Every structure is written in structure tokens, then in C-alpha cells.
Amino acid sequence: LAGTVARSGLIDKRGIKVGDLVLMTKAVAVEGTAIIAREFGSRLQDLGLAPDEIETCRRFLDNISVLPEAAVAASVNGVSAMHDVTEGGLATALEELSSAGNHRIRIDMHKIPVYSETARICGLLGLDPMGLIGSGSLLLCCRQYACDQLLREIRKAGIEVSLIGEIREPGKGIDAQHQLQPVTWPRFEADEITRLFSA
């Protein structure tokens, strides 16, 4: 996909600064949850997932576009970066964002939204949702003064959004914490979904 944009409207990841806040829309592993429900429905049913729960997960694909929230974010002054989550899940996407913006990122693990259906499926199959393909979720960075407006406008559009972290000093990498305690950031050589298809 290629296109043009006025220089004044360009949102470049290299523009992130120390103190910018990090938001994500929807939840982790939206696409991965849907794919697993579509491709491994019988297996999930054998593991105890009800047919209506599986159907709910399949319909996650109906909500996979990030264009609506990207359009809203582009209209808010103070947005410094956007990055869509894809293969490798949220963990990989945040590493990519850090690398592209050349700043470390602090992430509050307990603030990362996980749909109950995703948690259930990943628990049954032994997968980590942080490394599961996550198309459908958009990462956003913004100046602190813009955060409240950005949250408000995205929610007004009917889209879930959460504040999950903050841009730190120049460099590359993720500083993860849970309830203010440092924790190890998960890294994945391949998307978690490949373990299902290669089994």
C-alpha cells in the first residue's frame, strides 16, 4: 500500500518523545482468536468451549479494520505515532514501534486488555496471547496533553481503547512492569499461531 500525504499531516514514528503516552485499541490477539476459532473449532469444542463461544470468536474478524480509529487519531492534535499490530502479536509490535521511534517504551502489563474469549482459547491451547497475531488492534502514541481527547474521541466512535504505557529515554526495547514491579518482556521467534499449524 502506497500513497501521498501533505507534510503537515504526516504522523511519523520518529517523532515520538520522552513522556508520550502509549495507547492500544480493542485487545490483544483479535485476529488470532478468530482464526483459531475458524480453523480449530472442533478441537476447541472437544476441549470444552461451547459452540456459541466459538461463533463469537469467529465473528472477531468482523471488527478487524483499524481504519476507523486511525482516522479519528489523525484528527487529534498531538498524536505522534501509529502502528498496527500484526504477526508476532502485541509483543512484537511494541518492539517494532520502539525500534522505529528509537525510544524505549514502558509497558504496564496489567493494563493490557485481553478479551475473556482470547484468554480462554489461549489457556486451552497453551498459547501466549502476547505473541498471537493481533490484526485489529492499533498502537497509538500521543503527547500527554492530547491523551484525554484521544481517548474520548476514539470511545465516542464506539471503539475500545486503553492507556498501556509511556515512551522512555532514547534507545530500543521494552521495560515491562506489573503493578509497578519489573517483569520480563516476552519475545517470540515466530507467531504463536504457527505452533498450531505445525503440530
PLM feature spans:
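Active-site glycine-rich loop that binds ribose-phosphate moieties when present
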Residues: 1-12, 52-71
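Glycine-rich anion-binding loops of enzyme active sites
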Residues: 1-43, 166
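A generic local secondary-structure boundary/capping motif
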Residues: 7-15, 25, 70-71, 95, ...
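Active-site-proximal betaalpha loop/short-helix elements
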Residues: 58-134
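A short beta-alpha structural unit
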Residues: 135-141
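Helix N-cap motif at beta-to-alpha junctions
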Residues: 142-148
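Acidic, Ser/Thr/Pro-rich beta/coil linker or hinge segments at domain junctions
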Residues: 156-199
